[in-house]
A protein has these predicted regions:
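An N-terminal hydrophobic leader/cap segment in hydrolases
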Residues: 4-63, 69-73
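Catalytic nucleophile-loop/oxyanion-hole region of alpha/beta-hydrolase
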Residues: 90-93, 120-154
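Conserved alpha/beta-hydrolase
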Residues: 100-124
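Active-site nucleophile loop of the alpha/beta-hydrolase fold
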Residues: 184-194
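Catalytic histidine-centered segment of alpha/beta-hydrolase-like enzymes
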Residues: 307-317
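The serine-hydrolase catalytic nucleophile loop
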Residues: 89-101, 287
């Protein structure tokens, strides 16, 4: 019996050492590819043309639960709906101005477009947050502010691209806010293992070895390496203006998409959900969204002909489609 226990102890210790060795090895001895300024993977020409004629409000601050200031842009209207619309990876709220101006100008909704922590011109720690889940907390704090300011309005939370994923994560988990009525997902990122993922988009350089290693360490409560970069973004040089965010830490990247059981996060979204995807999206597999959302009876999927990844945010037709859904 003693011999058996001794052998079991040795095997257990050896397995633990091997597990830690693999976790630390994958985390520390792999690197994230440097972002390229030459790639043109997701039709940035639309973004260039859009920003030439933008009317963009100044950033305003709000205080989050950790006492720090985060920022948003505010588009006022007389509507009884408020949309909180969150930007995608790599940039910030500025590129959402055309959609926000349309919704507010047409009297469809008042719009708030936050710069997520780690993003935008005012961030103190670009590409990083303090811990996994802090993005959800910040969004909840903004939602509470909006509810206080607009107590009789419907609240819709929306996100484009990676922040569509962040919205799913928040809505499908324990941090969902009870005041939210509906969700708007514009070409949302789901998960690297979801059928919507496209391997050849050339937009992101994800270090899967590091992601796996850090995931292994996090599963046993080791989080002190979560500040390490896990992904970078190939944003063309001519659209960079020193307010972009070209790399994410592991803890920020994890916070920007649904959990590994992404089907469960989607299923648990118990409000009305509208998913808009362009048939010509260069980043995701547009024809797979129906399958990914099939277990949520509240979800409506709309595929726009001739629309690209940015097109679902920037095209006037997309603005009208979104407005029509909001007015239902």
């Amino acid at each position: 019996m003693k011999k058996f226990l001794k052998i079991s102890l040795i095997v257990g210790i050896s397995s633990g050492v091997i597990y830690l060795g693999i976790g630390y090895g994958l985390s520390l001895f792999s690197t994230v590819e440097k972002p390229s300024g030459q790639e043109e993977s997701i039709a940035f020409d639309k973004l260039r043309n859009n920003e030439q004629n933008l009317s963009v409000p100044s950033l305003e601050g709000y205080q989050t639960r950790d006492g720090t200031d985060q920022y948003y842009r505010y588009y006022e209207s007389e509507a009884d709906k408020v949309v909180i619309l969150v930007h995608g990876s790599g940039y910030h709220s500025k590129y959402l101005a055309s959609l926000a101006n349309y919704l507010s100008g047409e009297g469809v909704a008042t719009v708030y477009t936050p710069d997520l922590r780690g993003h935008g011109p005012n961030t103190e720690n670009r590409g990083d947050i303090d811990y996994i889940g802090q993005i959800e907390e910040d969004l909840n704090d903004l939602i509470s502010l909006v509810v206080d300011r607009h107590p009789d309005s419907s609240i819709i939370v929306g996100g484009h691209s990676s922040c569509g994923g962040a919205v799913i994560r928040m809505a499908g988990g324990s941090s969902h806010h009870e005041a939210v009525d509906d969700y708007l997902l514009l070409a949302p990122y789901i998960h690297h293992e979801a059928p919507t993922n496209a391997e050849d988009s050339n937009w992101a350089n994800e270090n899967l070895q590091r992601m796996i290693g850090l995931s292994m360490l996090n599963q046993i409560g080791i989080t002190h390496l979560n500040h390490l970069d896990a992904i970078s973004f190939n944003m063309p040089n001519d659209v960079r203006d020193n307010t972009e965010t070209l790399a994410y830490s592991y803890r920020l990247q994890i916070s920007m998409h649904p959990r590994d059981e992404y089907e469960q996060d989607i299923e648990f979204m118990d409000n009305r959900v509208f998913v808009l995807i362009g048939r010509e999206d260069q980043t995701f597999q547009a024809n797979q969204y129906e399958e990914v959302f099939h277990n949520n009876e509240n979800a409506k999927i709309r595929m726009m002909e001739d629309a690209t990844h940015f097109g679902v945010v920037l095209d006037e037709k997309a603005h009208r489609v979104i407005a029509e859904w909001l007015e239902l």
